[in-house]
A protein has these predicted regions:
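Acyltransferase/transacylase module recognition
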Residues: 1-24, 156-257
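Short phosphate-engaging motifs
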Residues: 80-83, 114, 220, 241, ...
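Structural motif
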Residues: 29-32, 98, 214, 301, ...
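FabD-like malonyl-/acyl-CoA
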Residues: 1-84, 129, 133, 210-239
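Alpha/beta catalytic cores of group-transfer enzymes, especially the acyltransferase/condensing modules
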Residues: 5, 43-191
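Acidic, low-complexity mobile loops and tails
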Residues: 257-316
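Short, well-structured beta-strand-loop connectors
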Residues: 35, 286-300, 321-333
Length: 337
């Protein structure tokens, strides 16, 4: 959904912001599916505003494409990539490999009938387990072609820039730092399989052994361990986990970053988070573009008021009216200067 994608994107960049202040800089960046937009914003190929607009356009386009072509996805565990592709071909229906995540971890997607047929065949071929996924469409398959066409126009307007730090593409698992290349790669990603395993192997071939996952989840860390022999991995989900990262890097004194090509959030972008679990209801008179003072009530979660601890301009609500939220889940995005 739009809100889930935007929340993940902004939350990941807030962690990146904290890491950058320590002077920790990457040799390469990569992101799984939506995470590719975070990686491009981190390296400066996209500005923060451009990234937000593209993520919103992408999620909306995927939602409508999913409604036009009803589809589903399933994780196939314990079967080689080529055998999963055989299962899809033998199903003789609309079903394809959508994610090559790690050795023995592949996701298929397509029509409900196609995924069901391929799942049965995958088990016959020796899959240890096939797990249906609760998703709103057959992402990264030809079912997303309408979304790809719509997103292509938005990407052209964003005009991705060249970067010094290369980003590994989901589409071809190669390192790219030319903005013009990303104009086509990002739109192709929607209807092409995510070659995440191959992205990890590309980084390993380029000499990467330390993999740091930033943002909510922690799933990619496990994939790196399964894919790259001798990989050192760590997941940093929140800025509060920076001490863990410093210890992992065996750094006694934080270094000061002298140069960074990506988008600095620092004191500019802020998230207002939920004070409790419950159903969020925004205040009707507070809209996008409203100037917010410290302590302004943006809405309620149950009986708890959602107050902004920052002054700034409301850019967007991340949670929608009636959405069930958890404590500290992002509710709104403000720009403070």
């Amino acid at each position: 959904t739009r809100n889930a994608q935007l929340t993940t994107f902004v939350s990941s960049l807030m962690v990146l912001d904290a890491v950058e202040r320590l002077g920790i800089e990457p040799s390469f960046c990569a992101g799984h599916s939506l995470g590719e937009y975070t990686a491009l914003t981190a390296t400066g190929a996209l500005g923060f505003d451009e990234g937000v607009r593209l993520v919103c356009e992408r999620s909306d386009a995927m939602f409508h494409a999913g409604n036009d072509n009803i589809g589903t996805m399933a994780a196939v565990l314990g079967l080689d990539d080529d055998q999963v592709e055989v299962a899809c071909r033998r199903a003789d229906n609309d079903v394809w490999v959508a994610n090559f995540n790690a050795p023995g971890q592949v996701v298929i997607a397509g029509s409900p009938e196609g995924v069901a047929a391929a799942s049965v065949i995958a088990k016959e071929l020796g899959a240890k387990k096939v797990m249906p996924l609760q998703v709103a469409g057959a992402f990264h398959t030809p079912f997303m072609a309408p979304a790809r066409d719509r997103l292509r126009k938005a990407i052209a307007l964003a005009d991705p820039r060249d970067t010094e730090v290369p980003v590994i593409s989901n589409v071809d698992s190669l390192a790219h730092n030319t903005g013009l290349e990303w104009s086509s790669l990002l739109s192709a990603q929607l209807s092409s399989p995510v070659r995440w395993k191959h992205c990890l192997l590309t980084m390993a071939e380029l000499g990467v052994r330390d993999f740091v996952e930033l943002g909510p989840g922690g799933v990619l860390t496990g994939m790196a361990k399964r894919t790259v022999d001798g990989a050192r991995t760590i997941s940093v989900a929140t800025p509060e986990e920076l001490d863990k990262l410093l210890e992992w890097l065996d750094t006694g004194t934080p270094r000061v970053a002298t140069q960074h090509e990506g988008e600095h959030l620092f004191a500019v972008e802020r998230l207002v988070v939920s004070p409790a679990a419950g159903v969020f209801v925004p205040l009707g008179e507070v809209h996008d573009g409203t100037h917010i003072a410290v302590g302004t009530v943006l809405g309620h979660v149950g009986e708890a008021e959602v107050r902004s601890p920052f002054a700034g301009v409301l850019q967007s609500y991340i949670a929608v009216d009636g959405e069930r939220v958890t404590p500290r889940q992002p509710i709104a995005w403000l720009r403070t200067v």
